[in-house]
C-alpha cells in the first residue's frame, strides 16, 4: 500500500477555515510573505503554511477570504481530490504558475494535520514508520565579493562557526570568489553542498553558468554536493566528470521529474511545498526508495508550522541526510 493510501482513508470533518497573515521582514531587508491556513472541525484545528513568494498573491488570497466550501469531504483523500479541482487563486492568477503547488501544499498539509488530530494519532504511527534525530545544514549566502575583502565575504559563515563549531553549510558559490575565500572555506571543512543556482532564470539569485566556474568549484570542493547546475553543451563535459556529486532541487516537482533527470542521481532535494500535493509527494518518496535514490530536504523560509512539518517529514523519511 502506498504512503498516500495509508492516510487517504483518514476521516475528516471541516466546519470552517481561516487565513492569517504571517509576513516577516528580516535584518537584510528581505520581507517573507506567508499565510497560515487553519482548518477547523470536530473541535480540532489543523494548520498549513502558504509559502508563495509574491506579496500580491498573498494579498489577493487574504482579501477574497475563505470563499471555498470545504465541508463536503469525509476523508483526507476526498479533500485532496476536491483541492485538486479548485482554483486556489480564484481572485487573480498567480504571478508564477508554480505557486499553485505551494498553495496546494498549504491546504493539504493543513488537512492532514486536522485529520491526524481528529483521529488522535501521529503520522509516523499511521504510516508504520518511526522518527529519528535529524542532521541539519545551515543554508546561508556569503556577502557580495564586490563589497569587500575575503573577511567581509566570509563573515556570515565565520560568525556562525564561532557560535556553533561543527556547523555544516549549504552555500551559493559565486564566480567572483577569490582563491582566499575558497581556501578558507576548504580549510574550515564546513562545506556540505554548493547550490550553483543554474536552474533559475531572470531571478535575483540565478548565477551565470560556465564550464570554467563549474570546474573550479567542483575541483576546489571534492567532497561537496553540486546542486542545480545548468546543463548545456558547454557545461556537460565538465559535469560528466562529477556526475556522482550532482544533485537537484529546483527542477523536482514529482517522481516523473526525478526519473527524467539527465543522470540518475545519488540523492535529490525533495521539498514538500515544491511538489505540492500529498499524493505526488508520496510518489516522489516512494520512487526514491524504490530506485535507491537518497533524499534530503530544504526549506522555503517558512515562518510557522510549515517549518515544523517539513522537519517532521525529514525525521521520518530521510533522517540521515540534511
Per-region residue spans from a language model:
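Broad gene-expression machinery/nucleic-acid interaction feature
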Residues: 34-36, 133-135, 267
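Metal- or metallocofactor-binding catalytic centers and their adjacent structured scaffolds
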Residues: 40-119
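Short alpha-helix boundary/capping motifs
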Residues: 29, 105-106, 278, 304
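Short helix/strand-capping turn motifs
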Residues: 320-322
Amino acid at each position: 500500500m502506498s504512503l498516500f493510501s495509508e492516510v487517504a482513508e483518514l476521516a475528516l470533518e471541516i466546519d470552517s477555515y481561516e487565513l492569517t497573515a504571517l509576513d516577516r521582514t528580516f535584518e537584510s531587508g528581505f520581507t517573507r510573505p506567508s499565510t497560515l491556513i487553519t482548518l477547523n472541525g470536530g473541535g480540532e484545528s489543523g494548520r498549513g503554511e502558504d509559502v508563495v513568494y509574491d506579496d500580491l498573491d498573498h494579498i489577493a488570497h487574504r482579501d477574497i477570504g475563505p470563499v471555498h466550501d470545504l465541508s463536503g469531504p469525509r476523508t483526507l483523500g476526498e479533500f485532496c481530490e476536491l483541492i485538486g479541482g479548485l482554483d486556489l487563486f480564484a481572485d487573480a492568477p498567480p504571478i508564477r504558475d508554480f505557486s499553485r503547488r505551494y498553495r496546494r501544499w498549504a491546504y493539504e498539509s493543513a488537512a492532514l494535520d486536522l485529520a491526524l488530530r481528529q483521529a488522535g494519532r501521529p503520522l509516523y504511527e499511521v504510516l508504520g514508520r518511526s522518527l529519528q534525530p535529524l542532521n541539519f545544514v545551515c543554508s546561508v549566502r556569503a556577502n557580495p565579493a564586490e563589497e569587500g575583502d575575503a573577511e567581509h565575504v566570509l563573515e556570515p559563515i565565520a560568525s556562525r562557526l564561532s557560535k556553533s563549531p561543527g556547523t555544516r553549510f549549504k552555500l551559493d558559490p559565486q564566480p567572483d570568489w577569490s582563491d582566499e575565500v575558497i581556501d578558507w572555506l576548504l580549510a574550515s571543512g564546513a562545506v556540505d553542498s554548493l547550490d550553483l543556482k543554474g536552474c533559475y532564470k531572470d531571478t535575483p539569485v540565478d548565477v551565470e553558468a560556465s564550464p570554467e566556474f563549474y570546474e573550479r568549484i567542483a575541483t576546489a570542493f571534492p567532497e561537496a554536493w553540486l546542486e542545480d547546475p545548468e546543463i548545456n553543451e558547454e557545461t556537460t563535459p565538465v559535469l560528466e566528470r562529477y556526475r556522482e556529486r550532482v544533485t537537484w532541487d529546483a527542477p523536482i516537482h514529482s517522481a516523473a521529474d526525478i526519473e527524467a533527470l539527465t543522470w540518475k542521481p545519488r540523492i535529490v532535494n525533495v521539498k514538500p511545498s515544491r511538489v505540492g500535493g500529498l499524493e505526488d509527494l508520496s510518489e516522489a518518496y516512494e520512487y526514491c526508495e524504490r530506485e535507491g535514490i537518497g533524499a534530503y530536504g530544504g526549506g522555503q523560509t517558512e515562518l510557522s508550522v510549515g517549518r515544523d512539518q517539513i522537519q517532521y517529514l525529514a525525521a521520518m523519511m530521510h533522517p540521515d541526510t540534511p
